[in-house]
Amino acid sequence: MAMPRNLPGQAAHDEADQEILRLDGIRKRFPGVLALDGIRLDLRRGEVHAVCGENGAGKSTLMKIISGQYLPDEGAVHYRGAPVRFRSASEAQAAGISIIHQELNLVPHLSVAENLFLAREPRRGPFVDTKRMNAEAARCIARIGLNVAPTTKVGVLSIAQQQMVEIAKALSHDARVLIMDEPTSSLTEAETVQLFRIIEELRADGVAILYISHRLDEMAQIVDRVTVLRDGRHISTDDFADVSIDDIVARMVGRTLDDAYPSRQSVPTDDVLLDVRDLRRDGVFGPVSFALRRGEILGFAGLMGAGRTEIARAIFGADRPDGGTIALHGRPVTIRSPREAIRHGIAYLSEDRKKEGLALPMPVAANLTLANVRGIASRFGFLRFDDEIDVARRYVQDLAIRTPSVHQRVRNLSGGNQQKVVIGKWLYRGSKILFFDEPTRGIDVGAKFAIYGLMDRLAADGVGVVLISSELPELLGMTDRIAVFHEGRMTAILDTKHTSQEEIMHYASGRSHA
């Protein structure tokens, strides 16, 4: 995926080395947490500057201060050579600082043009000047090479196209500083190449980009400098060409990670927990057959559209299959809903943990007990809140969930700790079969290692684990066997010890024999 680029620090203009943004001594406190402790950062025109750190390192808080969503408790922000104190995101945006969040901030039922000019529509008298708005939107989206009509509803666009709409929206505000939060997390390789092309063009126009990503390997293609944060502190800032990925990882976690994956302690038995035969959803997948053994981690590999998530959802009862059988512990079962699947000991950890795995406004304690409320209820049906707190504290300690208290709202936790809460929820339920769907997407290397360790511990305790992942090294590092899918069909089941990325991709592309 390599592409032509400027050398580190080399933008297209003489102004490239001119500082556009500087932060000095930034501190930010929340109840029970010092989120930022004396952070310093500078950003130059025409520069792509990566900010790296584990979840909880302070990246999101720092970006929210720069973009006007938070005020710092201490320290100074200088923008274009003058001290600033933005009191809202709209103030920062008006000054030329825009942020593109990982969860895109668009209105699906509105058109591209309406999203670009929401709350600032051009007017002719008391009426919106739709013709002018569409014309201006067309110019904005043409600048970034987005080939859609400005009247197209945003909801019908792909994630990559929606992200380009967000970039066009920022440019319509004449953004000179653009913050990109995990911009490639939901993109295909081809879409990532397109995004990097746009970033190169923005850099050439003198736009300064703060780039947040856990995908360190892709940074070499576009990043000029990299700043590492840890526990709310500034650790280092370097030209990207002067440091290795191992250096960055070691600074992020405060130690060297000799192995990306833990030494496996689990050994699968011959006891079959889940036996799926000829399962199908017409037009979606199948027929598919496989078995999951006690203590096994079974991988699901495949390209986008291969049907991996759809198969898991059908087994979990979220989608109704059109045929096939499911047996648990040797006994046929009929699963018509997630409630029935949960009762049978099956859990599904969705790839979208925020929408489908957590109740974000609720505290950690309530989320941990959500799947097994009866476990903390009296015989009269009343919740015993002291028991809920005891259960939550046990899992917070056992899973090393970083939170100021079990009363903290789960939306305030980092992505890795949110994922641990989801796992804890199913552990408290006593689930014996767990489907992990992209469990490490959007979390840092240290949190990934912790999640891997939990998965192996579950398998060692006799749980059957299915790992759905788009990361082939993850599948090779964590599984016993790998089932490969292509367009809804299983093309192979491979012994992980005796396969390779090349063989997996061979079958994932639909070929039957390596």
Curated annotation (Swiss-Prot):
E.C. code: 7.5.2.11, 7.5.2.7
Matches recorded under PROSITE patterns: ABC_TRANSPORTER_1 (PS00211), ABC_TRANSPORTER_2 (PS50893), MGLA (PS51260), RBSA (PS51254)
Location(s), subcellular: Cell inner membrane
Keyword Nucleotide-binding set for record: yes
Reactions this protein catalyses: D-ribose(out) + ATP + H2O = D-ribose(in) + ADP + phosphate + H(+); D-galactose(out) + ATP + H2O = D-galactose(in) + ADP + phosphate + H(+)
Keyword tRNA processing: no
GO cellular component, as recorded: plasma membrane
Membrane topology term: Peripheral membrane protein
Enzyme class of the recorded protein, top EC level: translocase
Domain ABC transporter, first and last residues per copy: 21-256, 267-512
Annotated residues for binding of ATP: G53, E54, N55, G56, A57, G58, K59, S60
Pfam families listed in its UniProt record: ABC_tran
Single annotated GO MF: ATP hydrolysis activity
Annotated keywords: ATP-binding, Cell inner membrane, Cell membrane, Membrane, Nucleotide-binding, Repeat, Sugar transport, Translocase, Transport
InterPro entries on file: AAA+_ATPase, ABC_carbohydrate_import_ATPase, ABC_transporter-like_ATP-bd, ABC_transporter-like_CS, P-loop_NTPase
Superkingdom of origin organism: Bacteria
Purpose of the protein: Part of an ABC transporter complex involved in carbohydrate import. Could be involved in ribose, galactose and/or methyl galactoside import. Responsible for energy coupling to the transport system.
Family stated for the protein in its record: Belongs to the ABC transporter superfamily. Carbohydrate importer 2 (CUT2) (TC 3.A.1.2) family.
Protein name: Putative ribose/galactose/methyl galactoside import ATP-binding protein 3
Organism: Burkholderia cenocepacia (strain HI2424)
Lineage: Bacteria, Pseudomonadati, Pseudomonadota, Betaproteobacteria, Burkholderiales
